[in-house]
Amino acid sequence: MNQGVACESDLLVVKMGIPRENSFPRTTELIQGIDYLVRQALAMGRPMVINLSFGNNYGSHKGDSLLETYIDMVSSTGRLAICTGTGNNGNQPLHEGGTLKQGQTRQIELSVSSREPTLNVQLWKSYEDEMSIYIENPSGNRIGPLDEKLGPQRYRLGNTELLIYYGKPGPYHLTQEIYIDFLPVETYVDSGDWKIILSGKRVRGGEYYLWLPGGNTLNRGTGFYEPRAYGTLTIPATARRVITVGAYDSLVDSYADFSGRGSRMLPYLKPDLVAPGVNIVAPVPGGGYRTVTGTSFATPFVSGSAALLMQWGIVNGNDPYLYGEKVKAYLRKGARPLTGYEEYPNEEVGWGEDVIIRLH
């Protein structure tokens, strides 16, 4: 018989809304779903573990997005633990970045495959750094330097229209986003090698990071030529107070290369730990089971472990304060190192494997 880690738990399931074509549910819908769960837990007077098998690439990946700020805030409300996956972008060419010095030029190459209906690029940098930005299409035609001004800027290169938005720092972050939308004049974006050129004008820190959308929204072959594997966590996995879960292959006791990786851009280390995420037997709608792979299926293992800890502590009266960061600390301390790593914790598997799942 197949059963989960905390198989006798009561489930409260929330549908986030209907995804639009080639898109995800809105961030506001996820916030509304979490808010509903938190209010229900408070009304019932019961501890709760929230499992978020959800993530996207939109944001600075520094834990300062609206969603992550909200999650960190609500984590201190009631007796909660929130678990989320690292995403499956670890082996995808969706992230680039580096450091630009004053007077230097950096060229980021982006391959766009044929029949790509649309795509976008986020460029994040420190607001204090001033950089000239140019964009070159596969035919060698170039626009730039772009004007830093409010409102959309519209350009045309070949059969592709570019919409460019310069962001500003916000109440919760110091960073600046330059959002570049590639739209077809007819049916598809011009395929081939695009270039984004950065030139340092007045630079203090110089770090810059770029992301393409994940979630299999792009055609195979579209991506950066020199991608970075570190910094591929999806959002909200970079939130400070969530329990961030990566995936490993339990059959060979090794890290799953698709699992998103943390990076030094965060002031704290992520992920927190890993759980089995390769060839997992899971139920399907209508009855029956099938095997699935991904961090969305690793996360529920840890959510179940958190639920068992909170049952032992809160429900059984052994520790009424066993929730939130305390649950994370217990899971980290008990984690088992995987083979092949000398340094722990690290940006691939965190503190190691969740061991509670081995007890059930």
Where does each model-flagged region fall?
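A glycine-anchored, Pro-Gly-centered beta-turn/N-cap motif
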Residues: 190-194
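Short acidic, glycine-rich surface-loop motifs adjacent to enzyme active sites
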Residues: 14-16, 34-62, 85-86, 199-201
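Catalytic cores of secreted or luminal carbohydrate-active enzymes
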Residues: 49-50, 67-97, 350-358
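Extracellular S/T/G-rich loop segment that most often corresponds to the catalytic His/Ser-adjacent loop
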Residues: 92-179, 183, 188, 198-199, ...
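Structural recognition of the beta-strand scaffold that forms the well-ordered cores
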Residues: 4, 10-15, 48-52, 81-85, ...
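Hydrolase catalytic cores
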Residues: 1-2, 12-20, 40-44, 130-132, ...
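C-terminal domain-closing interface element
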Residues: 32-53, 339-360
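Edge beta-strands of jelly-roll/beta-sandwich modules across compartments, strongly enriched
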Residues: 178, 204-215
